[in-house]
């Protein structure tokens, strides 16, 4: 059925004879469809511009336009995902060689791009820590704040993020990579050799905050270490109580003079440095005691451990007694015995660098409640709130990392169909904007026709999903200052509280109770049921940098595509009779039988697990002969969109109001939805040309004719099938004639009036397809070869897409084109049509490795019939 039959019959300005002529033979109808007058008459019905007195429609039942924003919905019961301990094997290249032989040049190139991934932008803009967690949910700002902070700590627990300890030190959990060994300071509580060799000074501050002393020649020295629980967020574990020993060490101060000091060193595996039996007390008494002693010594809220002179201050700072007593108060809890190095006894404590930090949460112990909704009631309800911060297994040196962030974070639904789980969104858009934006490398995108040529086979299909695929790729430690995220802590909810309060100023004490409010009090009570004592840790500010590849950077999709394509190449070389390809985090396998596919799947899961690659077993899909990939259903007959996309298009089209001006934002969104299914319609993308013209900041009025025509067009979908070269012909054109040449005949029709040469060439190709039935056409017009007919008149472009659907084109130079003379009205002697090299679109996609033929020569010592068949290499159909 002609696609315009219903449309032409509903146009009142067209007579019956004119309609029959337009729907008649193609040699008569196609030149008329290219006429400017007819296209203007049809466009006048479908492109009515809105008058000035009509208001634009900004929202339909399913599509929102200008001035209608969709408010984000926060789910208080969002589930935090559990990330596996992702760590790619250090000897990945060696394991590759063991499993599938030597790596190819392309595989080496792709893997070297990812081990480690490097990211060094031209310029980096740093933002204050107060913008670390975006307030995208004003009604649930407190709940979203703690949920986002918990998500970041979960990523740190999984070894995906670094934790900034100071501007030159980072800590993380997991195993270090070889390229970071030179930056190691501490690994599993032991000082690393590279760090000891690089420091020639007599004393240094370790990553845990203790004082490390140079080994004396008289005897070995044991460094003070601490062990945190393996899972801080899980059940509290009882730490072994081991006594400490007091040893005297020769210490050289910073000025070079020797001196003696006493250091309390606990045994390995102990989390208590001082004697827990003699000094144990509950958290409340310890906090009050320290606070009262401070007030006796110092009249102001802030204090230092030094005397007034600078030399005395340096000596006290590096003295083990003064620093150690303040830094590690010992206390005990009935369930857990947290690490003393991370706990501050009073409202002020020493951090990892030896400077004083302010704990807002513990400050409420030492103040009187300001009312019924004071946070003092919550803080005083629990004896032990745990440490203010925690440290990882490994500590490394890093480039200067400021106390700033480079991108904010917020939580959203995992995907539109799963609102029970959350996903972290990181905004690193600064690297894609402005004159300093980073130009990301381009990579090939799968073409629809190429997918049909490669995958439209009768194979058994299986799709695998790499769990947290981006977080498999490590990032160079030097790139950490450019990929910083963080949380401002509880002080964010008090605008009047300054982060830069100097010593001797008690403004924090005065403004501390500005936090207290009924809303915050009730929210923290509810959050305490969820987070428990971890609420104290989340209330502290922190800064983290990405150790693995983040999803918010434009470089990430390119690197992930290189990584997964290398995995697919390994699978293809290890299983020659298997089809394997990858797109982003999806790995697709194909085999001739289900049993063969099951065996391949079992082996791949084992190999990937040995390499440190985690597969999401829950998302493994066995598709049979109907592969679902990228929203398409791929079968042996071709490719069609999934039913959910077809229903979505139908719903959106039916919700469009008629004879009302729609704003251009609605037109843009509707065009994007229709574009996804357009290749499967008769007229293709050309049917949406009127909508494309309306997206240029103008409104669009849907007439009943155009609306009903689109509904009928999208109600009948045709699959995109494989390109097969069977019958071929060659076409050429002049402004007044066409020429068609096949192996058996020459055709030379003429036109009634002159046409542009580009229009005549596409009409000649349509006539050759209609008269000869050839699916392989040769032409010398580059526009026809591209298949993009949207630059032609609208009616001609729609009909040409319908006629040339499923046709392949080959370039034939004009000098060698046998249809050149027939197009000029000359009929020479019939010559054989030149052989057209049919090259279907493959988009440089590799699906399989050629299976080498088996040698027909057998060893003489083999006395039985070999089960190996002598055959040619197998290629998938």
UniProtKB/Swiss-Prot annotation:
The enzyme's E.C. designation: 2.7.7.7, 2.7.7.49, 3.1.26.4
Domain Reverse transcriptase: 393-634
Keyword tRNA-binding: no
Keyword Transmembrane included in the entry's annotation: no
Site residues by UniProt (Priming of reverse-transcription by covalently linking the first nucleotide of the (-)DNA): 67
Basic and acidic residues bias locations: 185-198
Signal sequence segment: none
Spacer as annotated region, ranges: 184-382
Record function comment: Multifunctional enzyme that converts the viral RNA genome into dsDNA in viral cytoplasmic capsids. This enzyme displays a DNA polymerase activity that can copy either DNA or RNA templates, and a ribonuclease H (RNase H) activity that cleaves the RNA strand of RNA-DNA heteroduplexes in a partially processive 3'- to 5'-endonucleasic mode. Neo-synthesized pregenomic RNA (pgRNA) are encapsidated together with the P protein, and reverse-transcribed inside the nucleocapsid.
Note: Hepadnaviral virions contain probably just one P protein molecule per particle.
Domain notes: Terminal protein domain (TP) is hepadnavirus-specific. Spacer domain is highly variable and separates the TP and RT domains. Polymerase/reverse-transcriptase domain (RT) and ribonuclease H domain (RH) are similar to retrovirus reverse transcriptase/RNase H.
UniProt name for this protein: Protein P
Organism (species): Arctic squirrel hepatitis virus (ASHV)
Record gene name: P
